[in-house]
């Protein structure tokens, strides 16, 4: 099992991100605040290494709900390191073997994998239980089957990511007593990273 150079060596643990930027060639999970302490939007993110600090621009892959009760897949450029709504950033895998940044986020790499994850049509029975979290977890299965992410237990990964988010929110609330994240949350306060290559 390979680990990323400079990563802590303790398996099955999350560790604070070092510095104020992400690492190139990695796939991250990003949770953003939705206005409730235990409710987050779940997103995949690949940072663009050409823009510094790394993480201030990159491609996010996620689903969003629309006004008519349906869901749709979106791919968009985002800044996660300075976003006031980011609660947790968790490293999932080194995806540099897929090529450079444009290759990784392009039409022949991660994009078709994410697009293959089923989204229930508006008005169907499955739409009531569907969320960005359930889509994210289904996408982890696809990424695992395609040998992009090594994850033997998706539910354990979900618990670990949620733990990071709860820890970040608790730490923030203890420090300020406010009911929502401030606009200047620092990356080392709110973020955790996971060793890649560790079966979960």
Please provide the spans of the model-predicted regions.
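Non-catalytic ligand/cofactor/substrate-binding and regulatory segments of enzyme domains
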Residues: 2-130
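Activation targets extended, charge/polar-rich intrinsically disordered C-terminal tails
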Residues: 115-200
